[in-house]
Amino acid sequence: MTQTETMAAAGAAKTEPKVRPAKALQGVKGMNDMLPADAPLWEHFENAARAMLRAYGYQQIRTPIVEHTQLFVRGIGEVTDIVEKEMYSFTDSLNGEQLTLRPEGTAAAVRATIEHNLLYDGPKRLWYTGPMFRHERPQRGRYRQFHQLGAEALGFAGPDVDAEIILMCQRLWDDLGLTGVRLEINSLGQADERAAHREQLIKYLEGFQDILDDDSKRRLYTNPLRVLDTKNPALQDMAANAPKLIDFLGEESLAHFEGVQRLLKANNIPFKINPRLVRGLDYYNLTVFEWITDKLGAQGTIAGGGRYDPLIAQMGGKPAPACGWAMGIERIIELIREEGVVPDAVGCDVYLVHQGEAAAQQAMVAAERLRDAGLDVVLHASPDGKGGSFKSQMKRADASGAAYAVIIGDDEVAAGVVQVKELRQREQAEGGGQQATVPADGLVDYLIDAMVGASE
């Protein structure tokens, strides 16, 4: 290379732009990842919930995350906080439809029930779970994406089903080992009873307009019941002395509410009647309830629900009674942590350690045979693709939570055997796991027999 060429090359190198590392992207605020370390708690909750729902004869339903916006406007109520301020809504650029990420599950479950005529052959007990979305300020126990478990009893009118859905929650708290969760109940009566109460309530609240906050003033003539649900400390005395809806209930509504109370008492479920409990959704009538804990600060309500008899007809279906509940899973997971409930870590049955090309091939074949037999197996793979030493692999085997390590090297391949080392079964009783040499073609039977024996 000539001197001129050398100088030109050096100049080009100097002017070559520096490549900056790409900025790491982060998740949306208020929408959280569930990481492997959290999985045992979630599985603990989900397994308990599914078992409880099966015990009461509920069937699962799954609905889309996106629904027509009008579904929630009609179903939840136009003057609710959810519809007015919290929904993620957008216009579909393909057809101009107004769509919304679902903020709750009941409206969608009712829509599916009507659309697919699920009540044609009688009442249904349905349950659902999945992510919901609300555009609000993230804080402990309140997120923009959260997960909800819900149950809907459709086509049942009696107080027995109101009581049963409350009992379902209590059974779940017991199964999860949760304590200190208290039940509050109320009755919202029927539409005509609420109208009579509403008239008197508005007159009462008008006398406090000088102290009402902006939210309460906005609701005064549209949804005055929600004013009683205020969290504003300055309005608590006003709300406590307001006309009580229960004083406006007729004989049928009172009989229904008394029936719920009788059944709760018969099943030894303690409760408190809270005349200010109205829930945040417009579709409720008669029974409403909330399960509350003092261990999560301001976000203490972990489940709530009640009866919503008008909703099915309101959404275009044949009139049918209904009731149900929903619970926020993240809040319950947080409560499980607060209670110190620690579910067993989820480990595999077998970790396969190998070294050498022939051993790697045999290990993969052995892993598939063990999986065919119903065992959970992790086959060692190293980050650099070179396998790693037996010592480093055994460290990974121990960290995996496996009950057994199966070890295959060149000597084992040549002899047609494998080494099986116990990692868990006897380390407490005998100071460490034992190791055995096992014929390769007898590995499946050996491990199954060993695991059965260890569980007895």
UniProtKB/Swiss-Prot annotation:
A single cellular component GO annotation: cytoplasm
Molecular function GO terms recorded: ATP binding; histidine-tRNA ligase activity
InterPro entries assigned: aa-tRNA-synth_II, aa-tRNA-synth_II/BPL/LPL, Anticodon-bd, Anticodon-bd_dom_sf, His-tRNA-ligase, HisRS-like_core, HisRS/HisZ, HisRS_anticodon
Gene3D superfamilies registered for this protein in UniProt: Anticodon-binding domain, Bira Bifunctional Protein, Domain 2
Listed EC numbers: 6.1.1.21
Protein biosynthesis recorded as keyword: yes
Chief location: cytoplasm
Keywords, comma-separated and alphabetical: Aminoacyl-tRNA synthetase, ATP-binding, Cytoplasm, Ligase, Nucleotide-binding, Protein biosynthesis
Catalysis performed (reactions): tRNA(His) + L-histidine + ATP = L-histidyl-tRNA(His) + AMP + diphosphate + H(+)
Name of this chain's protein: Histidine--tRNA ligase
